[in-house]
Amino acid sequence: MDDDIAALVVDNGSGMCKAGFAGDDAPRAVFPSIVGRPRHQGVMVGMGQKDSYVGDEAQSKRGILTLKYPIEHGIVTNWDDMEKIWHHTFYNELRVAPEEHPVLLTEAPLNPKANREKMTQIMFETFNTPAMYVAIQAVLSLYASGRTTGIVMDSGDGVTHTVPIYEGYALPHAILRLDLAGRDLTDYLMKILTERGYSFTTTAEREIVRDIKEKLCYVALDFEQEMATAASSSSLEKSYELPDGQVITIGNERFRCPEALFQPSFLGMESCGIHETTFNSIMKCDVDIRKDLYANTVLSGGTTIYPGIADRMQKEITALAPSTMKIKIIAPPERKYSVWIGGSILASLSTFQQMWISKQEYDESGPSIVHRKCF
């Protein structure tokens, strides 16, 4: 496909927005889903200060801004800011005119219907796209792994969900959703670092903690044993240099933080961990297809890239499943972007071209057409 008519694929995550052209093997633009507004009054005239900043620019000026994420738990909570992010995506990052390209958007399963209707409306009415489609994130991850059957455990910044898919069909009755993901882990790390005597409170400092989390955290294979090791020696301690040059030391926090994925009670949540959620999702499926799901458990999303997470999932699910069951956890190296990659594959298939919602269909039926045309 040519860039001039290629479809645009935009994976709007709660934490990062991934965007690019269908047929490419990686997104061209990856930037934080942040809109920042100045905290202070501008006093220098003629500096061209803006009333809002998006993405990396907001991130780099975070010291003077209040940062807001318009997508929380996979659901858009602020449409004005969301429009700014889309505008930034098309005009500044991809440098395309959205009225010339079909646009594929993604969303979390079990999202409110109004959410996808509003997405559809903005695409056609604000950006005048010729055609668009909304795809379920986990389904795209499975496409990207080259499978048509499997269960996807997709965990990003805002939401985690397990989606069993059989022969290309998602099984909606067995989809489970857990509102515990990367952002909750960042907040939890802020909390446990405070207990160590380091104070992180502002929206800008949260971004520093997110960086600590991404660079130093890992999942322990055996949590209790790891805690004992950490208590008896300093072998697990690592140091991190803050932007102001101060160096902090972090020990058992490195694995206590992501442990909350397996023990949500750490965050005061009553829900099951990601291993049990995956198991429960499989158990909601027909008994005949469970074997195929156990053998094709695919991890996807940025919160699944902690070192050690695949081995731990293997261990936990093996303990829950029947003893003779073959269990395989697939953790593709590109899983941070597998939703986007799956979207790129889908939007460039010749068989997909009749699936788009066209501007004409939208004008005839209104936003509710999205429920009829997009699973």
From Swiss-Prot:
Residues recorded with modification N6-methyllysine: 84
Complexes and interactors: Polymerization of globular actin (G-actin) leads to a structural filament (F-actin) in the form of a two-stranded helix. Each actin can bind to 4 others. Identified in a IGF2BP1-dependent mRNP granule complex containing untranslated mRNAs. Component of the BAF complex, which includes at least actin (ACTB), ARID1A, ARID1B/BAF250, SMARCA2, SMARCA4/BRG1, ACTL6A/BAF53, ACTL6B/BAF53B, SMARCE1/BAF57 SMARCC1/BAF155, SMARCC2/BAF170, SMARCB1/SNF5/INI1, and one or more of SMARCD1/BAF60A, SMARCD2/BAF60B, or SMARCD3/BAF60C. In muscle cells, the BAF complex also contains DPF3.
A Pfam family reported for this protein in Swiss-Prot or TrEMBL: Actin
Disulfide bonds: none
Other facts: In vertebrates 3 main groups of actin isoforms, alpha, beta and gamma have been identified. The alpha actins are found in muscle tissues and are a major constituent of the contractile apparatus. The beta and gamma actins coexist in most cell types as components of the cytoskeleton and as mediators of internal cell motility.
Cellular component, GO annotation: actin cytoskeleton; cytoskeleton; dense body; focal adhesion; nucleus; plasma membrane; protein-containing complex
CDD domains: ASKHA_NBD_actin (cd10224)
Modifications made to the protein after synthesis: ISGylated. Oxidation of Met-44 and Met-47 by MICALs (MICAL1, MICAL2 or MICAL3) to form methionine sulfoxide promotes actin filament depolymerization. MICAL1 and MICAL2 produce the (R)-S-oxide form. The (R)-S-oxide form is reverted by MSRB1 and MSRB2, which promote actin repolymerization.
Catalysis performed (reactions): ATP + H2O = ADP + phosphate + H(+)
Tele-methylhistidine PTM sites in chain numbering: 73
Positions of modified residues (N-acetylmethionine): 1
EC identifiers of the protein: 3.6.4.-
Organism expressing this protein natively: Sigmodon hispidus
Top-level enzyme category: hydrolase
GO molecular function: ATP binding; hydrolase activity
N-acetylaspartate, modified sites: 2
Main location: cytoplasm
Chain positions with Methionine (R)-sulfoxide modification: 44, 47
Protein name: Actin, cytoplasmic 1
Lineage, opening ranks: Eukaryota, Metazoa, Chordata, Craniata, Vertebrata
UniProt KW keywords: Acetylation, ATP-binding, Cytoplasm, Cytoskeleton, Hydrolase, Methylation, Nucleotide-binding, Nucleus, Oxidation, Ubl conjugation
UniProt family annotation: Belongs to the actin family.
Function recorded in the entry: Actin is a highly conserved protein that polymerizes to produce filaments that form cross-linked networks in the cytoplasm of cells. Actin exists in both monomeric (G-actin) and polymeric (F-actin) forms, both forms playing key functions, such as cell motility and contraction. In addition to their role in the cytoplasmic cytoskeleton, G- and F-actin also localize in the nucleus, and regulate gene transcription and motility and repair of damaged DNA.
